[in-house]
Amino acid sequence: MPKMKTHRGSAKRFKRTGSGKLKRRHGFTSHMFANKSQKQKRKLRKSAMVSAGDFKRIRQMVAKMK
């Protein structure tokens, strides 16, 4: 059985925290900023954690990632 390869697209989008959780960026941040409020744009700048339901699936794709 061959080794599991790290999904390179996922490895570039997620970072592992010290406690083992996965950190991600918010969506809706590439264009159309005139239609978003200042509060919404400020909140989108911060990073977020991957939810528990998605974590199980993403963990397999980035298993070897540090």
UniProtKB/Swiss-Prot annotation:
SUPFAM superfamilies: L35p-like
Entry GO MF terms: structural constituent of ribosome
Top-level division of the source organism's lineage: Bacteria
GO terms (BP aspect): translation
Entries under InterPro entries matching the protein: Ribosomal_bL35 (IPR001706), Ribosomal_bL35-like (IPR021137), Ribosomal_bL35_CS (IPR018265), Ribosomal_bL35_sf (IPR037229)
Keyword Transcription regulation assigned: no
One Pfam family in the UniProt entry: Ribosomal_L35p
Compositional bias segments (type: Basic residues): 1-28
GO CC entries: cytosolic large ribosomal subunit
Xref: Gene3D superfamilies: 4.10.410.60
Region entry Disordered, spans: 1-50
Keyword terms of this UniProt record: Ribonucleoprotein, Ribosomal protein
Keyword Ribosomal protein (UniProt): yes
Family statement: Belongs to the bacterial ribosomal protein bL35 family.
Alphabetized HAMAP family for the sequence: Ribosomal_bL35
PANTHER family: 54S RIBOSOMAL PROTEIN BL35M, LARGE RIBOSOMAL SUBUNIT PROTEIN BL35M
Protein name in UniProt: Large ribosomal subunit protein bL35
Gene from which the chain derives: rpmI
